[in-house]
């Protein structure tokens, strides 16, 4: 059996990681993809073993210390799951390196959840002793991210988000038929 290693997104096996998910692999033919707004994706890998993974979380934590069915939405849980899965697949903690993406502020007037998410990810990784070798967080654009865990390559594309209110025009109603004199319409 021949194994091929390439960074060609058209030939790679794509795994889309959605909100609340994580995925880990050592397969050199896999590219992980996600789309982020204020959410964060951490791409963590062991460059020596070739094991890597991506998560995608919505909020840094629940704020109330609960561990319930919604835990997958939160950064602390997502980071723990990703790191533990990497270690189970043969990665070594002392060799892990991270790249983080997302954390945009997409809507004016709302709290900056994206900045909180990015700050959480940076703090968590620092506290765990995992260096961040690259990051692209903040700003006002959503991101499309592709991550090749075996090589560590990441491709990011900014996605335009137009928050300007659209000029909505209501269709002109058709004219009402003329009522013949003496006729009465009852509703």
UniProtKB/Swiss-Prot annotation:
Pfam families referenced in this protein's UniProt entry, alphabetically: CheD (PF03975)
Record EC number: 3.5.1.44
Highest taxon listed in the record's lineage: Bacteria
Catalytic activity, as annotated: L-glutaminyl-[protein] + H2O = L-glutamyl-[protein] + NH4(+)
Keywords per UniProt: Chemotaxis, Hydrolase
EC class of the enzyme, as a word: hydrolase
GO biological process: chemotaxis
MF terms (GO), sorted A to Z: protein-glutamine glutaminase activity
Residue ranges of the region described as Disordered: 164-187
Biological role: Probably deamidates glutamine residues to glutamate on methyl-accepting chemotaxis receptors (MCPs), playing an important role in chemotaxis.
HAMAP family per UniProt: CheD
Family note: Belongs to the CheD family.
Protein name: Probable chemoreceptor glutamine deamidase CheD
Gene source species: Caulobacter vibrioides (strain NA1000 / CB15N) (Caulobacter crescentus)
Higher taxonomy: Bacteria, Pseudomonadati, Pseudomonadota, Alphaproteobacteria, Caulobacterales
């Amino acid at each position: 059996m021949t194994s091929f290693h390439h960074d060609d997104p058209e030939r790679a096996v794509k795994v889309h990681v959605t909100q609340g998910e994580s995925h880990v692999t050592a397969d050199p033919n896999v590219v992980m993809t996600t789309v982020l707004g204020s959410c964060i994706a951490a791409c963590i890998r062991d460059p020596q073993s070739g094991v890597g993974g991506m998560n995608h979380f919505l909020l840094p934590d629940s704020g109330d210390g609960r561990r319930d069915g919604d835990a997958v939405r939160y950064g602390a849980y997502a980071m723990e799951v990703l790191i533990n899965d990497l270690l189970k697949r043969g990665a070594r903690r002392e060799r892990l390196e991270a790249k983080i993406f997302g954390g945009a502020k997409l809507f004016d007037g709302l709290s900056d959840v994206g900045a909180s998410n990015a700050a959480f990810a940076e703090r968590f990784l620092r506290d765990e002793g995992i260096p961040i070798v690259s990051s692209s967080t903040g700003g006002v654009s959503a991101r499309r991210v592709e991550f090749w865990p075996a090589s560590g390559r990441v491709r990011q594309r900014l996605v335009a988000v137009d928050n300007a209110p659209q000029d909505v025009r209501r269709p002109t109603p058709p004219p009402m038929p003329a009522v013949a004199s003496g006729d009465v319409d009852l509703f």
